[in-house]
């Protein structure tokens, strides 16, 4: 497997890999990583669909990319997906997945057309004082010292950040800024999370720094993530004869480990609670989704809280990874990520408006018609003075194809599940859906004497507790996550958010899909390049632009410095003034 960039590799079709007709594939899970791997097995690996098996412990595929209506409970979306125009693997695959709505078009086609016609941007990124515009006004509000802390982190070698927290590299100069408000709520970072991952995010999305304040860097699907992303992949795979095995738990994978060689030998299953085994040869490839950010999820209802129960159950992704990791140190250290659910949890809630009484309060903040079918909030709106650090969003409506006319479906999340609310004086994790809605309505500016009535009769709210939703953000060191294909592995790979790949960032659709593609290309030795992570971190134009954007448009020559440094800077500017370098610095407003 090798990386590539440019159209030469992007538009090429690889030859059929040698011996692929004698091979079979078994995939643990049906999340985005596993579905991506299966699609690449079909498209580029040219493996027969009937040789490909996906094991799903539940009745529905999709993993964390869900979106459904639970009978008697209501619509539920545990999370949302923010996409980027440089998710190179995602677009490489989705150009080949047919649209379910537009004949002759791909998922990429309809996504591209949609976001061209209706580009995303926010008209109100944050509120305070019960629904009043916080007037962050597109500003980062970073001091010179805060900017220097970001720059220092950007250039710090990875190994110096192993097992370090963000609090080890930033102080109040960053934490009190609008930058941190935007960043932590957009990506769900907590102060105690990994400084290494923070650095990787900075480098990965340096080309989008200017789009952080109003979220114009983002792109969204037409419907919820399940209907817009997962379902087209399922239909593609089913159309090629790929076999899905539901209500099938993978309880263990047994390996034969010899010097210089690692081989998966047996898959242990529970199929409808009956034990089964699949014996493996070198021609039987296994793709393992280890860990899981939505394991131990609980769903509440309008009248019931979502219970916080982080117990790791047999047959889930963490239990499986622990059993696998016990067999070889190259298989990672799951305990680094799943041992402290108080530091890895947050809550979300899906709110459905039942009439038009709440709509004016939404419209007052987003400054758009929520029923237009176009962008509504343009990403999350954060109540910056919320005790729960509450954020909420309404994407294009309807969010579900079967959504009743006149209803809106939106999403709320709180980063702090264990602190009291501002109207509901108890932690979010102890609240029913109705109570979470009441807290949200309070921060929308609804008159207090109307809040309970609206929450009870004009909305249905379903809370979700996810104890391990940011487990991958915990501080880590080399070897904590297994390589996609560990050294010496002959017939297996790790895929998903807890597999290690170069330069990309976790908690993204692209990361899951990249690991799936890399796994297939490595094990089948497909002769085509995997598109590399977009190289903006090496593009001087993006670096110069970000340096000025982070200072809210002020040139670097305005940095506070003593007279000696100012004199030296002036002399340096004089030397490059009539050169291409000088013109570049002027173009990007560095000087």
Predicted regions and their residues:
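Extreme N-terminal leader/targeting segments of oxidoreductases
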Residues: 1-25, 43-51, 550-591
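Conserved FAD-binding subdomain of flavin-dependent enzymes
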Residues: 72-113
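Rossmann-like flavin
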Residues: 100-207, 219-220
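A short, Lys/Arg-enriched amphipathic alpha-helix followed by its capping loop at the start of a domain
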Residues: 37-50, 236, 240
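Glycine-rich Rossmann-fold phosphate-binding loop(s) that bind the pyrophosphate
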Residues: 29-32
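C-terminal segments that line or cap access tunnels to active or ligand-binding sites in enzymes
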Residues: 207-221, 283-285, 290-515, 521-535
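Glycine-rich FAD pyrophosphate-binding loop
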Residues: 42-69
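Helical element adjacent to the flavin cofactor pocket in flavoenzyme catalytic cores
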Residues: 203-285, 290-291, 303-304, 309-318
